[in-house]
């Protein structure tokens, strides 16, 4: 092992931290433009997941086994895979220290390790997730259990939570609630189940055009909404959930509700190794990488970039956003490498959220930094459509594995 460690190449023209959607598709697109590039990808993961399908897994409409492949299978052939985790960023020395204690240096660094799930911020959940009615679509292991909970509930109370931090796939906490409600409606038990949505946010969705449709969906299923309520504790023995209530940014109250099943969306933040580095936004406890929102260039370290869920860009943290971010970053990197200056290419904050509102129903929300719709199709995408559900269920997973990760979409 020591011999292998020493012989491993330790300097890269471009070092990418993170082998998820952002890191793999970025490397693939870079190599398509120039196969001679010297790129290292640092990620310890054995497996690569297609996470957007976990909502459908939780709704019993997608096989969880089809959401995973080996990381080796998606790694671009020309890239050097550093199968270690980043533990320390030293941008003043152009260096990253790995979990193996190796110091890797770079000409350009791209930080895209994804987002961290902060389960520790919910008291009492440790050791109880995935049993006794406590579930989440945010892990590969527990998404199938969500459907078990939905299927077995015939009467009682179901809670669906959304934290007060930015999260990946902002619509996910409510999408599973709509699928569950539709399942119960189809099986004639919705009238015997109280469905509650507890959200740390202040609105159902940030873009009015789509929010108007979602409010009708909520009405259709008889869902009770509680905004500015943030889950802080679960008491599994009593089947109770505790929420802090916010007003004007301050906690003003604490409320407790009972549940028979609870779908939890954990608070999220940048990984700790970013929070504890000079790359994080100063004074922001969530620790996002501090970059220009149009070019992804770090505001203090010009040879450092960040895209995807860990960056400070204020867009929706979705795979669709990454798909629009990657070509811009490719242009920026090539311009820096070849001409020593930024490219004209800019990112407009595009994000997309395929909002599942029931089985065979979907609202395809697409919007920019100004929360203005930027729609792909020539019809009104705020309407629930069967065709858009098929897009999410069949087309997008294929596109991900066969085009996006290969740098051709």
Identify the residue ranges that each predicted region occupies.
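Beta1-alpha1 glycine-rich phosphate/pyrophosphate-binding loop at the start
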Residues: 2-80, 164-208
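FAD-binding core/adjacent interface of flavoenzyme oxidoreductases
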Residues: 2-12, 79-175, 179-188, 263
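Glycine-rich, N-terminal phosphate-binding loop of Rossmann-like dinucleotide-binding domains
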Residues: 19, 100, 113-114, 245, ...
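A Rossmann-like FAD-binding core segment of flavoenzymes
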Residues: 36, 79-89, 104, 185-286, ...
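FAD-site-proximal beta/loop scaffold in flavoenzymes
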Residues: 127-154, 258-324
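Rossmann-like dinucleotide-binding core of oxidoreductases
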Residues: 152-226, 318-352
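C-terminal, flexible cofactor-proximal segment of oxidoreductases
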Residues: 330-409
């Amino acid at each position: 092992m020591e011999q292998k460690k020493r012989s491993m190449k330790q300097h890269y023209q471009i070092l990418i931290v993170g082998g998820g959607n952002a890191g793999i598709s970025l490397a693939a697109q870079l190599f398509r433009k120039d196969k001679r590039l010297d790129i290292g990808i640092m990620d310890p993961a054995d497996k690569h997941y297609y996470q957007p399908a976990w909502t459908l897994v939780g709704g019993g409409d997608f096989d969880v086994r089809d959401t995973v492949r080996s990381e080796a299978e998606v790694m671009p052939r020309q890239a050097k895979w550093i199968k270690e985790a980043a533990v320390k960023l030293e941008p003043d020395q152009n260096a990253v220290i790995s979990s193996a204690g190796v110091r890797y240096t770079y000409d350009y660094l791209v930080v895209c390790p994804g987002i961290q799930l902060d389960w520790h911020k919910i008291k009492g959940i440790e050791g109880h997730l995935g049993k006794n009615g406590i579930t989440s679509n945010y892990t590969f292991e527990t998404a199938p259990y969500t459907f078990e909970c939905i299927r077995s509930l015939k009467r009682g109370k179901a809670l669906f939570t959304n934290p007060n931090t930015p999260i990946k796939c902002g619509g996910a906490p409510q999408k599973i609630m709509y699928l569950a409600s539709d399942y119960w409606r189809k099986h004639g038990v919705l009238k015997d189940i109280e469905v509650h949505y507890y959200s740390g946010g202040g609105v159902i969705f940030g873009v009015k055009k789509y929010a108007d449709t979602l409010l009708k969906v909520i009405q259709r299923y008889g869902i009770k909404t509680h905004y500015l309520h943030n889950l802080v504790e679960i008491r599994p023995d009593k089947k109770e959930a505790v929420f802090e209530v916010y007003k004007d940014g301050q906690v003003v109250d604490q409320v407790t509700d009972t549940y028979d099943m609870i779908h939890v969306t954990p608070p999220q933040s940048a990984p700790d190794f970013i929070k504890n580095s000079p790359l994080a936004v100063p004074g922001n406890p969530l620790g996002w990488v501090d970059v220009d929102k149009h070019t992804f260039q770090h505001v203090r370290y010009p040879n450092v970039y960040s895209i995807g869920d860990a960056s400070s860009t204020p867009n929706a943290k979705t795979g669709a956003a990454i798909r629009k971010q990657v070509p811009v970053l490719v242009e920026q990197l090539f311009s820096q490498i070849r001409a020593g200056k930024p490219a004209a290419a800019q990112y407009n904050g595009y994000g997309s959220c395929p909002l599942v509102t029931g089985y065979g129903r979907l609202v395809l929300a697409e919007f920019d930094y100004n929360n203005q719709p930027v729609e792909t199709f020539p019809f009104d995408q705020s309407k629930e459509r069967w065709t858009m559900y098929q897009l999410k269920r069949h087309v997008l997973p294929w596109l991900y594995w066969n085009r996006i990760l290969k740098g051709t979409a």
